[in-house]
Amino acid sequence: MKPLIVLNLKTYLEGTGEGAVRIARACKEVGEASGIEIAIAPQFCDIYRVASQVDVPVYSQHLDGVGAGSFTGHAFAKCIKDAGAVGTLINHSECRLKLADIEASVTAAKGEGLRTIICTNNIATTAAAAALGPDYVAVEPPELIGSGIPVSKADPEVVTGSVAAVERIDPAVKVLCGAGISKGEDLKAAIELGSVGVLLASGIVKAKDPKAALEDLVSLI
């Protein structure tokens, strides 16, 4: 099974507007050359821009568990899907939700056929998230996000423990590894610890050459 790489553009200027399109093209080119699925999660306003210009899997950075109607300021599943997204992040550490809201978001996303990635911060929350039946959980200790120190080195037990916990609860759910991921050795270590891929951001988005950074990321797989 080839790993999954999900690149979160957050609200970085480098990944905004046409910058999002340029990085998406790099994801497509490196993904095709390596045979590895590389998805991208742009800002809401760039989902359609990216999806309509680049043939690459696009994820939303967030999704609210509401439908059409009187929900000013919310992002609902059908709108996100119609914009061109194939999946969504839920409960990123920079956009945290209560458990009931996470469940509502997962249900709404599944209703539109969107893939779901619930972000978690430790083994206990990973286990709780797995019980909601997402496609993936992405375990990311917040203190390591953007640090350049990969979780696979700083806290490998949180990855192996999360993999074991998810396997007990729902073997259909897969585990991604996040926080501090930026190099080929980080992805290789994440896979060796039992995850099926990585969720990452600044190590690629803010690199001088995002395509070269992506090529390094997949170089050991």
Curated annotation (Swiss-Prot):
Gene3D superfamilies: Aldolase class I. Homotetramer; dimer of dimers. Pathway: Carbohydrate biosynthesis; gluconeogenesis; Carbohydrate degradation; glycolysis; D-glyceraldehyde 3-phosphate from glycerone phosphate: step 1/1. This is Triosephosphate isomerase. The lineage of its organism: Archaea, Methanobacteriati, Methanobacteriota, Stenosarchaea group, Methanomicrobia. Belongs to the triosephosphate isomerase family. One of its GO terms (biological process) is glycolytic process. The active site is at 92 (electrophile), 140 (proton acceptor). Keywords: Cytoplasm, Gluconeogenesis, Glycolysis, Isomerase. Its main location: cytoplasm. InterPro entries: Aldolase_TIM, TIM_sf, Triosephosphate_isomerase, Triosephosphate_isomerase_arc, Triosephosphate_isomerase_AS. Involved in the gluconeogenesis. Catalyzes stereospecifically the conversion of dihydroxyacetone phosphate (DHAP) to D-glyceraldehyde-3-phosphate (G3P). Its EC number is 5.3.1.1. GO terms for cellular component: cytoplasm. It holds the Pfam family TIM. It catalyses: D-glyceraldehyde 3-phosphate = dihydroxyacetone phosphate. PROSITE patterns: TIM_1 (PS00171), TIM_2 (PS51440). It is an enzyme of class 5 (isomerase). The keyword Isomerase applies. Substrate binds at residues 8-10, 145, 180, 201-202. GO terms for molecular function: triose-phosphate isomerase activity. It is found in: Cytoplasm.
